Amino acid sequence: MATLYREFKPSVIYLTNGKKLNQNLTNVFLKNSTLVYLKGTYTMEANMQTIRRVEFDDRQYDVIEGQLAELIDSVGNDCVYRVDYLDMDAYQAQLKNNINISNISLGDQISTSTVDLNTEEDFKFPLVHKYYMCYNGETFPVHEREIWRRLPKDKDIRRMFKTIITKQGFSWTSDESVSELLRAIISVSKTEQ
C-alpha cells in the first residue's frame, strides 16, 4: 500500500464538529492523499468530509478540497500547503521496469524467469506535488494567475511578485520557492499598510 510512513503511527485528528480524536494507527494514503487507519486487520479510509486537521508527531495536515495538505510554512494566518499524490503512471512504469523477465531458448523449451527487484528499502514512490496558499483568509492553488488575481493592486507588490517568480532558481514546485514567495508578499503587504 502506498503510504507516507512505512508503519502506521499515532495522530491527533481534529473533526469539523470541533471534536478531537487520538488515533493510534494512522497513515497518509498517497494515491489520493487521504487519511487511512487500521481497524483490526483491515485498512480503512477515513471520511475526509468530517476531518479538519491531522497532526502527526512530525507534520501537520489540514484538509483542502477533501485531501490532506501538509503545512509547509506560515506567517500569521497566511500559509503554504503541499498535497502529495502518487503519480500512478510513473508508479506503474517503475514497477514494470523493476521486474526483470528473461527468455532463454533451450532447444524446443523456453525458460522464463521473473525476478522482482522491488525492495522496500530501495523503493521510492514517484510523487506529484500540488501547492496551495492561504492568503487573506482565502485558500487557492499556487499558480501565477491565481496569486496575481489576489494581490493588492499596489505597483510595488506586483513588481516584487514578478521579480521573485522570474528569479533564477525559482520553481512553482519547490517548498522553498513557494515559501519565499509567501513571505515576500506578506512583508511587502505589511510595509504598504
Residue spans for each PLM region:
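Flexible, solvent-exposed short loops/turns enriched in glycine
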Residues: 128-162
